[in-house]
A protein has these predicted regions:
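The Walker A/P-loop phosphate-binding site
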Residues: 2-109, 117-126
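Hydrophobic "anchor" residues on beta-strands that sit immediately upstream
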Residues: 131
Length: 135
């Protein structure tokens, strides 16, 4: 005999207007972008999901930009396109190169304001850029 919760679960799942799926549905598994750091890839199930928003959060000088360079390096190794939106105006081409990034193949935007940053990111995503970094 089904419980009320089980009945509700089935009813909601079958309602096509809601577009629900089961949380362990294989269709929800995404391709990933590797960090290129085996230990980090291991704990993140292979990196960050492609075509999804991912926030890397941490204190000042904690390695956030470095992790983003490693993700971008992985994208470049697969001949993907990188868009880097530098809101901090801290782009350092020499340091990025030392981290493994081919800066000759990075689309760089230093936006004038938040709207400019947003419009650049939206255009990049719409055109099919493989990774967008907002730094």
């Amino acid at each position: 005999m089904k419980t009320n919760a089980e009945d509700l679960f089935e009813t909601l799942l079958q309602d096509k207007n809601l577009g629900l799926s089961i949380g362990n549905d294989e269709a929800l598994e995404y391709d990933r972008i590797s960090f290129g750091i085996p230990q980090l890839d291991n704990i993140t199930n292979g990196g960050i999901p492609k075509k999804r928003f991912t926030l890397i959060y941490g204190g000042w000088s904690s390695g956030k930009s470095y992790l983003c360079t490693k993700l971008c390096e992985s994208v470049q190794k697969e001949n993907g396109t990188v868009l880097w939106v530098d809101t901090e105006q801290s782009w350092d081409s020499e340091w990025m190169t030392q981290c493994g990034l081919d800066t000759n193949k990075v689309l760089l935007k230093i936006p004038e304001n938040a709207e400019d940053a947003y419009n650049t990111m939206a255009a990049g995503m719409e055109k099919g850029v493989d990774i967008v970094v907002l730094d």
